[in-house]
Amino acid sequence: MTMAASNPLPEQLPDGGAVHPAHKSPERHRHIRQVPDTPRRWFLATMAAAAATTAFNANIAADYQLTERSQFRVTTPDNDKNRTAANRFPGKTWYLLPGFGVSYRDAGRKLKALQPAMNQRAPASYIGYANGGIDIAQLFIAIQRDTFERRIDTVYFYGDSFGGMAATVLAGLLEEIGIHVRVIVMGSSPSSVRDVLDPSKEYISLAGKVVPYLGLVGRLAAGVWSGLANPNGQGMYEAARAGIGRSFNQASDSLILKTTQATFLQAFPTQYDGGIPSSTGIGLLYDPKDFIVNARLAIVGWEALFPKNPHFEYDIPDTGHASPEIHPDVYRVALTVILDQLDPPPLTTRPVQPIF
């Protein structure tokens, strides 16, 4: 009785007592545990990869949609001052070439600030770069088309920072087709990458490979960076907000355009093949304490590139870097003085003849 009670009863099999080979049972149970896990892991991995790819593509697509502008644009504001200047100075025009990262809309603001001084010599226009990147040939074609339509034979260039480099290359090309470039004004323009004080210039080559694939994320970072790097008298918070605002402005430049501008800057002046005659005046407009461009090095560089051309230097202290839209009165006076020196205005009255 005692021995019988101590013997345990055999366990009941889950399928009602069917006998199964012992060596197959563990294999069956392992199979049951693993089969559902493997597809689930693959499914989750596939979904994660798809989500990442979608987010990446959406990021780039959003950046493109935000900045869609496929052609270079020449814009001549239709206002009374420009019409009056066109009547006074037929066959002449100004072209403002914007700087690095300056949007089409901001280029218009810069022109508006400078137009009263520009109109003392010619009507004023500004250029909008294409978001596909800097292409001097296409930019030249856009300007050539505009000069043909308006019958322009004399051009004045205002180069806003980076725009001074582009103006230099374009001026030589325009001279080849018979259009004379009377004056080029360098508004805070570096003469080479060595003049640039921004330490990030060391990463231009890397940026050329990486930046075009950053989309909106890169746009946000670039906005903060540009705002803090060029506050123009604003506090850190206001400068960062302004930078982000410019970066996400629908008229803002694409990251691809900014990257090609940077690589163009790094290579300059190798793109310049000469062709600018010694009669073309070179205006040099700088804040001596510019924190983006070393003004002294830039001036020396331009004078070395154009040793036979007339130069005139005008300092605009405490204005920061390339900021006519922020300090319009200062820039108008400066531009007026430069033009009076390099391109004296035509006489409107007969000079007084001395008695003796």
Residue positions per predicted region:
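N-terminal secretory signal peptides
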Residues: 1-38
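N-terminal export signals
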Residues: 29-36, 42-62
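Short, surface-exposed "cap/lid" segments of acyl-processing enzymes
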Residues: 70-118
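Conserved alpha/beta-hydrolase
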Residues: 115-133
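Gly/Ala-rich beta-loop-alpha elbow adjacent to hydrolase catalytic centers
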Residues: 159-167
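Active-site nucleophile loop of the alpha/beta-hydrolase fold
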Residues: 185-195
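Serine-hydrolase catalytic core
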Residues: 232-311
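Catalytic active-site module of serine/aspartate enzymes centered on a nucleophile-bearing elbow/loop
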Residues: 313-356
